[in-house]
From Swiss-Prot:
Entry binding sites for Mg(2+): 234, 255
Function comment: Exhibits a very high intrinsic GTPase hydrolysis rate. Involved in the addition of a carboxymethylaminomethyl (cmnm) group at the wobble position (U34) of certain tRNAs, forming tRNA-cmnm(5)s(2)U34.
Chain residues that bind K(+): 230, 249, 251, 254
Organism, scientific name: Pelotomaculum thermopropionicum (strain DSM 13744 / JCM 10971 / SI)
Name of the coding gene: mnmE
Protein name: tRNA modification GTPase MnmE
Keyword field: Cytoplasm, GTP-binding, Hydrolase, Magnesium, Metal-binding, Nucleotide-binding, Potassium, tRNA processing
PROSITE patterns: G_TRME
Cell compartment(s), UniProt: Cytoplasm
UniProt similarity note: Belongs to the TRAFAC class TrmE-Era-EngA-EngB-Septin-like GTPase superfamily. TrmE GTPase family.
Length: 459
C-alpha cells in the first residue's frame, strides 16, 4: 500500500544524543500537525527541506519533548513522498511516546524496510541501490563501505543496464531472422553474434569472479583462534585488536566461552573468535566452552592454530591439528621471543604439512605484520581490488549474473549447433531477465517482499 502514511523510529533504540521518528506518506504533515506545535502554525507552507523548532504535546496538552522537525516535500525525498522527521532527545521513552502519537493520529507502523521499499516502488532507487542501503549500515571496514557506496551510486546498475542493452542488440539480430526466416543470417553476421556473445559471457564471468571478494568485504571472514590451554590465544586476540579484550593469565582454561570481535585487516573484516583451549577436562563449565570451540572450528573460514614455543609440542597439539582437517590453517608459533625454544623450525614445518607457519610474540607484538599479510594472501590470494573496480557483494546478484552467463552460453552453443533461432532467442531473453533481477526490472512481488523484510524497521 502506497496510499497510506507510515511511521517508525529510524535510529537505534537506546540512550543517545538524538533519536529520529520518521513519517512518510500523503498525510505525513497532517499527522505531525496534530501533536507538533511551533510559533508558526502554517509551518508546512514555509517551503520544503526546512528545520523547524517546536514541541511535541500529548493529548492532555503536556509537553513530551523539545524537538527539531525536518519537513521535506515530495518528490525530493528518500521515499518520493512527503516526509517528516522529528528529531527528539535520544532516550527510549520520548522516542516511543512520539511514535505512539504519530500512530494514534493516523499513521501506520512501518514494516521492516518499508521506507526503502517505497523508495524502490516510487522509482527513487532501483533494487540493487536499495539493497546497498543495508550494506552501508552493516559495513565493517572502509573497503566494505566503498563497495556498498559504489552500488548506491548506481555503478552496478549502470553496468547491468549496459549488459542488458548489448543483449537486446543480439536479440534483435536473432529475432530479425525469426520474422524473416527466408533471409538466412549471413556468415559474417553469425560470427559477429558469436563474438559479441562470448565477450558478454567473459565480462559477466569476470564480475562473478570478483564476487567472492565482495562477499568477504560484505560479510567478513569467520576466523577462529584455537590451541591447547595457555599457549597465548587470548594474547594473540588482544595483540590483533590492539586492546585488552580477553583475559590473559597463567591459569589454563581461563577462557571458558567464545569471545567474538570484528577487526580490520587491511580492509578485510575478520570476525575473529577466541575459543577455550581444546583439551579433555572434568570441569563442566570449561567442557561447554571446549564444545563451543569445536563448533566454531567447523564453521570457520580460516583457522589460526597457536603453538607454544616455550613448552614445545604435546599430544594435545597433535590431536588439535587432526581436528582442523582440510580447513584453511595458519600455524602460529607463539612466544618466539623466549631464549630456549622447544619447537624447531623444521619441526613446525613438518607438522604443518606444507601449510604456512609464522613465528610471533603476541606479548611483544613481533611478527603480526607478517601474520596480517598471510591472512590477506590466504583469504584473497593477496589481492585487494582497486577502488575503481566494480565488485558485487550480494549473493543474490552473483547468482543472477551466473544464470545470465549460463543462458548466454546456451544461446552461443545453440547458434554453433544450428539450433532453431527461436530457441536461441529464448535463451537470450532469459539472460536479459536474469540481469533484470538485479535491478528489479524483472522480479516478482514476493521476492521484493523477502528482500526488504531483511531490513531494519525505520529504514
Amino acid at each position: 500500500m502506497l496510499d497510506d502514511t507510515i511511521a517508525a523510529i529510524s535510529t537505534p533504540i537506546g540512550e543517545g544524543g538524538i533519536g529520529i521518528v520518521r513519517i512518510s506518506g500523503p498525510d505525513a504533515v497532517k499527522v505531525a500537525k496534530k501533536f507538533f506545535l511551533t510559533k508558526r502554525k502554517d509551518w508546512d507552507q514555509a517551503g520544503s527541506h526546512r528545520l523547524i523548532y517546536g514541541h511535541v504535546f500529548d493529548r492532555e496538552g503536556n509537553i513530551v519533548d523539545e524537538v527539531l522537525l525536518s519537513f521535506m516535500r515530495a518528490p525530493r525525498t528518500y521515499t518520493r513522498e512527503d516526509v517528516v522527521e522529528i528529531n527528539c532527545h535520544g532516550g527510549i521513552v520520548p522516542l516511543r511516546k512520539v511514535l505512539e502519537l504519530a500512530l494514534a493520529n493516523g499513521a501506520r507502523l512501518a514494516e521492516p524496510g518499508e521506507f526503502s521499499k517505497r523508495a524502490f516502488l516510487n522509482g527513487r532507487l532501483d533494487l540493487a541501490q536499495a539493497e546497498s542501503v543495508i550494506d552501508i549500515i552493516r559495513s565493517k571496514t572502509e573497503a566494505g563501505l566503498r563497495v556498498a557506496v559504489s552500488q548506491l551510486r548506481g555503478d552496478l546498475s549502470r553496468k547491468v543496464e549496459d549488459l542488458q542493452g548489448r543483449l537486446l542488440g543480439l536479440l534483435a539480430q536473432v529475432e530479425a531472422n525469426i520474422d524473416f526466416p527466408e533471409d538466412d543470417l549471413e556468415e559474417a553476421t553469425v560470427e559477429d553474434i558469436l563474438r559479441s556473445g562470448e565477450d558478454l559471457i567473459e565480462e559477466i564471468k569476470e564480475i562473478v569472479r570478483r564476487a567472492e571478494a565482495g562477499k568477504i568485504y560484505r560479510e567478513g571472514i569467520s576466523t577462529v583462534i584455537i590451541g591447547r590451554p595457555n599457549v597465548g590465544k587470548s594474547s594473540l586476540l588482544n595483540a590483533l585488536l590492539r586492546e585488552n579484550r580477553a583475559i590473559v593469565t597463567d591459569i589454563p582454561g581461563t577462557t571458558r566461552d567464545i569471545i567474538e570481535e570484528y577487526i580490520n585487516i587491511r580492509g578485510i573484516p575478520l570476525k575473529i573468535i577466541d575459543t577455550a583451549g581444546l583439551r579433555e577436562t572434568g570441569d563442566a563449565v570449561e567442557r561447554i566452552g571446549v564444545e563451543k570451540a569445536r563448533e566454531a572450528v567447523e564453521q570457520a573460514d580460516l583457522v589460526l592454530l597457536v603453538l607454544d614455543a616455550a613448552r614445545g609440542l604435546t599430544e594435545e597439539d597433535y590431536a588439535i591439528i587432526e581436528k582442523v582437517g582440510g580447513k584453511k590453517v595458519i600455524f602460529i608459533v607463539n612466544k618466539a621471543d623466549v631464549r630456549e625454544k622447544k619447537i624447531s623450525s623444521e619441526g613446525a614445518a613438518r607438522i604443518a604439512g606444507g601449510r604456512p607457519v609464522l613465528w610471533i610474540s603476541a606479548l611483544e607484538g613481533t611478527g603480526l605484520d607478517k601474520l596480517e599479510e598471510k591472512i590477506v594472501e590466504m583469504v584473497m590470494g593477496g589481492q585487494v581490488y582497486p577502488k575503481d573496480e566494480l565488485i558485487i557483494s550480494n549473493t543474490r546478484h552473483r547468482m543472477a549474473m551466473e544464470r545470465a552467463a549460463d543462458h548466454l552460453a546456451e544461446a552461443v552453443s545453440g547458434i554453433r549447433q544450428n539450433v532453431p533461432v527461436d530457441v536461441v532467442a529464448i535463451d537470450l531473453r532469459a539472460a536479459w531477465e536474469s540481469l533484470g533481477e538485479i535491478t528489479g526490472t524483472t522480479v516478482t512481488e514476493d521476492l521484493i517482499d523477502r528482500i526488504f523484510a531483511d531490513f531494519c524497521i525505520g529504514k
